[in-house]
């Protein structure tokens, strides 16, 4: 048997053929831009988090009397431990940055529309899992901000009528954030990334059922090329740029995205003057603060994810690409500016004028999803280039 025949025989095996179908010979629109590379970057970030997390867990002790010191032990005594910790801590931020760009690219190019509704829904589930994973990972360092952040966020469950206090006690494993809470959060933080891997594979399989969208929103069976080698090379450029960007944070600004109070051991007696979550929680924190009543603030969080889930089912877009929808472009950039404003408001103290200003961005955020169907109707006069039967 020749080498070529042996290679072809291997590609026909079940696992090899699946990998070949989805990662090598996968038909891809020829006009994809670099914005379509953030999906593979997110996968790389997930692998980095799992690998560094496993090695860090080998040296971590999930006990309230030892957790903080075990983290310092990793930093001071374990060879390369500082690199592992900074890669893991900053890797979480890089992961969220990449996923945010991936989400906003999908919003701009309407990649969520028919027939890819399920792809979008799985993406929202993955995003929600990422938020929970990030929160459970913020507690194990057991610094002052970790302790009080866990106390404040878990206490929000008490706003649920009837069963709220019971849920809080169950989350804590007692009547306050203590050793049981730390063990639970550490265990969940170790488990959730592997659930994320499974959800990501489902997300990829759902995407490959109908194929990728493209910047023009034009579906064509003819104008497609195999993923390898063309887009591997294109993605490789993005991977190198990401590696440089990631390295700058690790080696030159490893603590910029953290909080200095987390270098103080957790102490339930003094309350920090300003409890601030990690930057990726700031928009949610701003929405929570925008409504004075705690129950109202908690209730405002659910519609954020409901709107993201419902967006693919707004059957109103005759033209998919924002290149042909100037009104949608303007609304999109307004949403992006609003998202940045939410992040800025979330890190400000709860005082005037930030309280008043903070009530405007959540309104604009929900307004975006309310008016999204309108530009699609207005733009129906522009030629509809998408002719796939699945979208009729």
From Swiss-Prot:
The keyword 4Fe-4S does not apply. This is Cytochrome b. The keyword Iron-sulfur does not apply. Component of the ubiquinol-cytochrome c reductase complex (complex III or cytochrome b-c1 complex) that is part of the mitochondrial respiratory chain. The b-c1 complex mediates electron transfer from ubiquinol to cytochrome c. Contributes to the generation of a proton gradient across the mitochondrial membrane that is then used for ATP synthesis. SUPFAM superfamilies: a domain/subunit of cytochrome bc1 complex (Ubiquinol-cytochrome c reductase) (SSF81648), Transmembrane di-heme cytochromes (SSF81342). GO terms for cellular component: mitochondrial inner membrane; respiratory chain complex III. Heme b b562 binds at residues 88, 189. Heme b b566 binds at residues 102, 203. It comes from Pisum sativum. The gene is MT-CYB. It comes from the Eukaryota. GO terms for biological process: mitochondrial electron transport, ubiquinol to cytochrome c. Belongs to the cytochrome b family. It is a multi-pass membrane protein. Its cofactor is heme b. Heme 1 (or BL or b562) is low-potential and absorbs at about 562 nm, and heme 2 (or BH or b566) is high-potential and absorbs at about 566 nm. The chain crosses the membrane at residues 38-58, 82-104, 119-139, 185-205, 231-251, 295-315, 327-347, 354-373.
């Amino acid at each position: 048997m020749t080498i070529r025949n042996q290679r072809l025989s291997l590609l026909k095996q079940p696992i090899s053929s699946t990998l070949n179908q989805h990662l090598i010979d996968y038909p891809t629109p020829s006009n994809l831009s670099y914005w379509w590379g953030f999906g593979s970057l997110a996968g790389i970030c997930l692998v980095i988090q799992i690998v560094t997390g496993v090695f860090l867990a080998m040296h971590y002790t999930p006990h309230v009397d030892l957790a903080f010191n075990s983290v310092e032990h990793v930093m001071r005594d374990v060879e390369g431990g500082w690199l592992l910790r900074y890669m893991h801590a900053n890797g979480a931020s890089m992961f969220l940055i990449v996923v945010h760009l991936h989400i906003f690219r999908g919003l701009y190019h309407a990649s969520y529309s028919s027939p890819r509704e399920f792809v979008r829904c799985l993406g929202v589930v993955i995003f929600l899992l990422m938020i929970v994973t990030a929160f459970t990972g913020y507690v194990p360092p057991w610094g002052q901000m970790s302790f009080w952040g866990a106390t404040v966020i878990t206490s929000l469950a008490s706003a649920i009528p009837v069963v709220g206090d019971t849920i809080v006690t169950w989350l804590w494993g007692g009547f306050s954030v203590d050793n049981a809470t730390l063990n639970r959060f550490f265990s969940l933080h170790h488990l959730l990334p592997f659930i994320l891997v499974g959800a990501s594979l489902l997300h990829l399989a759902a995407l490959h059922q109908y194929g990728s969208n493209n910047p023009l929103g034009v579906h064509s069976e003819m104008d497609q090329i195999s993923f390898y080698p063309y887009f591997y090379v294109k993605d490789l450029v993005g991977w190198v740029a990401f590696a440089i960007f990631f390295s700058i944070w690790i080696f030159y600004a490893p603590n910029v995205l953290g909080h200095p109070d987390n270098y103080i051991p957790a102490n339930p007696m003094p309350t920090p003057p300003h409890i601030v979550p990690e930057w990726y929680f700031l928009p949610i924190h701003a929405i929570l603060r925008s409504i004075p009543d705690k129950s109202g603030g908690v209730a405002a969080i659910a519609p954020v994810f409901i709107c993201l889930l419902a967006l693919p089912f707004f059957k109103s877009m005759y033209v998919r690409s924002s290149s042909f929808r100037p009104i949608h472009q303007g609304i999109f950039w307004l949403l992006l500016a609003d998202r940045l404003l939410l992040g800025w408001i979330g890190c400000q103290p709860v005082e005037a004028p930030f309280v008043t200003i903070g009530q405007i961005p959540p309104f604009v955020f929900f307004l975006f999803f309310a008016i999204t169907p309108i530009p699609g109707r207005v733009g129906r006069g522009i030629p509809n280039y998408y002719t796939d039967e699945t979208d009729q």
